[in-house]
Structure formats: structure tokens, C-alpha cells
Amino acid sequence: MLNFFLILNLVFCSGFSDSLETNWKLKKEENNIKVFLRKTLDHRQEYLAETIIHRDMNSIYEEIIDYNSSYKWMYKLESSKILDKKNDSLFYVQFTIEMSWPLKKRDLVSDVKIKKNKDFISISLVSSPDYIKSSDDFIRIKDSKSKCVLSKIDNETTKVSLQSYAVIDGIPSFIVDMFIVEGPLFSLSNLKSKF
């Protein structure tokens, strides 16, 4: 299996792997967004992107969890939708991801779990590949984790941290290298522009 970063940026701030081969390394800083990378012992490439948005935490949260509109601002998403909302802290979403020829389009089905307090919101997505039947039109991404952490700095300033990895078959490593940094930069820049 080759690693490919998840185009979803939703998502991210705490580590997903117990054992790490390397620590985070800053790879790019642009538009007040920092993107860090690291590899785990099982050779997954993870990214962590951080920025400050001058808006209250709850407004940013509402924008992020509007998964029916995520495709409008997230990198390479062709479509996005909420499949099932169990309650305010658990629901299921599906994303379809545009891939350049000759690669086949991907889709991802994830659960979304939300934890909140007055100064902190965590939005975690974990792949749930069997939640709905897969389509022949897409190759399903079966292993991914993403997390978005919103941390209140003050009433009008929020730190946003996105962390993610995904594993998909058949993606050459040079493609991974082209997009793993640009994806979170694109998505966080678009998110910031909404405020």
C-alpha cells in the first residue's frame, strides 16, 4: 500500500500513532498557515496544519461541520454530504474526491465525533468504509483519520489545527509528495477567507 494524504483537512491536532519514527517537521509556511509533516513507524505520512482565524470559535465550528458544503472549500473534493446524523456529537459523512487522469476517483465514508467545552472543540473523523455500500464509480478509501481542533484564544480569535492521514492503494509516492503540503494550505486558506 502506498500512502496518500487525505484531501480532507478536516481534522487533526493530536497524534494518531503510538510510535513515531520522526517528530513534526515544518515543511511550508504561507498566508500565516504552517504545515508540518511526519512519518509513523508504519510509514504513514501525516500532516498537521495550524493557523489563527480572527473569528469566534463557534462560527468557525459551524462552517466546518456543514459537510454538505465542504466540497466548496476543501481541496479536491468533488462532493460532500451528511449521510446520517445520530445526534449532535455523532454523524456520518461521505466525500468524493477528484483525481487526475489516469487515476480513478476516490470516496471516503467517515464517522464524525465531536467533543466541546467553552474553550475547545474537537472534530474527529475516522474512516467507516462499510457504513454504506461502495460504488463501482469510486475506489473507497478504507484507512484514514482526521482531526480538527479549535482552541479559543479570545472571543474573536481562534487557533485552528488540522491533522490527517489516509492510506489508499495504487497512488505513486511522487503524487503524494505533490499534494500533501498543498492540500491543507488550500483548505485552510479557503476557510480563513470565509471570515
Descriptions of predicted regions:
Residues L2-C13:
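Sec-dependent N-terminal signal peptides
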